[in-house]
Amino acid sequence: MAQTEIKSYTLNFGPQHPAAHGVLRLVLELSGEVIERADPHIGLLHRGTEKLIEYKTYLQALPYFDRLDYACPMNQEHAYVLAVEKLLGITVPPRAQYLRTLFNEVTRLINHIMNTTSMALDIGAMTPLLYGFEEREHLLEFSERASGARMHAAWFRPGGVARDVPPDLLEDILKFCDSFPKYLDDVEHLLDENRIFKQRTVDIGKVTAQQALDWGFTGPVLRGCGVPWDLRKSQPYDAYAAMDFDIPTGANGDCYDRYLVRMAEQRQSIRIMRQCIEKMPDGPVKAVDHKVTPPSRGEMKSSMEALIHHFKLFTEGFKVPEGETYTAVEAATGEFGVYLVSDGTNRPYRCKIRSPGYVHLQGLDLMSRGHMLADVVANIGSIDVVFGEIDR
């Protein structure tokens, strides 16, 4: 009998595939149903963000950051405003720092709910998504009440935040903090010991701690490998130095551990949100420097200088002293960094964006080799790719 030879063949996964999480085109080399190579093709959502920023004032460039990782927009804004503030050398009022920290965690929950539930949906569990999006709706409502927008907030500004929160919003967030752990318990009851969910995630996409560090992984992907690295602890910014929270880590670096880390992080986010509200100081929410922050309506009605400051700020912007900085924050997906270069004018000379999803997507080949075709879906879900920030 003649021996049959199985030839490897190529399969295009996406960009129309619902589990591609956007516009991912993955060229897979398969031997039967086993993956020999996974080659991500990116750029289908490239909009030239970094170049566009060079033609805008520092204030006009801010909304571009909401449109990068549109699943956790305020984290991206935070990195940019911290970079601008560092170059300007201005101090942010304590209340603004606490409000930023609070909404950083609100945004982290928005992202983690989306990620954990859609990953479960991708591998066959529909119920968590239906539970999760009900809770996520409350969080998007908090964002809307604070900034006026559910997604593209543009609420963080150089020098503070755009406006103070409504009086009853903090009470409502505190009530949410009381009810939210029940949702986490329900999802964990559905998934943690679910035989099918564990078969689809345990020992799938394993990465060792050393491999994760070599590839530059950050966030839940790195912490899932057992490395307790979190910029909120190691390089605290705004009010994080005053917060008491733990860094959840995994042990095996597989899809299941990455899921567990994200679930545990949601409980830590609730802890941080409570502390922010309990310790929230009174006072202004933006620096009192009208060359950088706009004056109030009341001031403009009585002061000609205030009116001039307002007009100049929104037409010409402010000049930033010459210099450069790399400023990073712990976004929901990992280390989101902004390398900002100023040449002393009112526009950035260069703005390089370091997006965690871009780095994690490079590791998809490492995670997928030797696994089955169906496991690619679990891997993509567990690294949490968002193409707004990958393609920029």
UniProtKB/Swiss-Prot annotation:
PROSITE patterns: COMPLEX1_49K. It comes from the Bacteria. InterPro entries: NADH_Q_OxRdtase_suD (IPR001135), NADH_UbQ_OxRdtase_49kDa_CS (IPR014029), NDH1_su_D/H (IPR022885), NiFe-Hase_large (IPR029014). It is found in: Cell inner membrane. Its EC number is 7.1.1.-. Keywords: Cell inner membrane, Cell membrane, Membrane, NAD, Quinone, Translocase, Transport, Ubiquinone. Its main location: membrane. It is a peripheral membrane protein. GO terms for molecular function: NAD binding; NADH:ubiquinone reductase (non-electrogenic) activity; quinone binding. GO terms for cellular component: plasma membrane. Pfam families: Complex1_49kDa. It catalyses: a quinone + NADH + 5 H(+)(in) = a quinol + NAD(+) + 4 H(+)(out). HAMAP family: NDH1_NuoD (MF_01358). NDH-1 is composed of 14 different subunits. Subunits NuoB, C, D, E, F, and G constitute the peripheral sector of the complex. Belongs to the complex I 49 kDa subunit family. NDH-1 shuttles electrons from NADH, via FMN and iron-sulfur (Fe-S) centers, to quinones in the respiratory chain. The immediate electron acceptor for the enzyme in this species is believed to be ubiquinone. Couples the redox reaction to proton translocation (for every two electrons transferred, four hydrogen ions are translocated across the cytoplasmic membrane), and thus conserves the redox energy in a proton gradient. This is NADH-quinone oxidoreductase subunit D. It comes from Rhodospirillum rubrum (strain ATCC 11170 / ATH 1.1.1 / DSM 467 / LMG 4362 / NCIMB 8255 / S1). The gene is nuoD.
